[in-house]
């Protein structure tokens, strides 16, 4: 069992790794994420664009599930948003949704899977 001093040290360590410049990410948003890819001794940024269908808030372990459809095949990836591999996060557009998880989009195809845009 952790004593209070150890727990405070762990909390301070977590706070040092949390990114503070992240945009407000909500379910249904279309994001463009820049992911750092290391190939040999070269490093580049690869962009991944898709819709946020799930979000799990857990301080430093906060994850988002992003879904995109590529050549008719749905692809989902889970990203740790505070990871050093995530170089950038840009919100392309906001959508009006009434669910906390959009897993039902997995069963929809084409125009049926579109979400209404929300203007802010």
From Swiss-Prot:
Keyword check for Plastid: yes
Compartment list: Plastid, Chloroplast
GO terms for cellular component: chloroplast; mitochondrial large ribosomal subunit
Main location: plastid
Entries under InterPro entries matching the protein: Ribosomal_bL19, Ribosomal_bL19_CS, Ribosomal_bL19_sf, Translation_prot_SH3-like_sf
A Gene Ontology BP annotation from the UniProt entry: translation
Organism domain of life: Eukaryota
Keyword entries, A-Z: Chloroplast, Plastid, Ribonucleoprotein, Ribosomal protein
Residue ranges of coiled coil: none
This protein's record includes keyword Plastid: yes
Pfam families tied to this protein: Ribosomal_L19
Any one Gene Ontology molecular-function term assigned to this protein's record: structural constituent of ribosome
Family as reported in the entry's similarity comment: Belongs to the bacterial ribosomal protein bL19 family.
Protein name (record): Large ribosomal subunit protein bL19c
Source organism per UniProt: Thalassiosira pseudonana (Marine diatom)
Gene name, Swiss-Prot/TrEMBL: rpl19
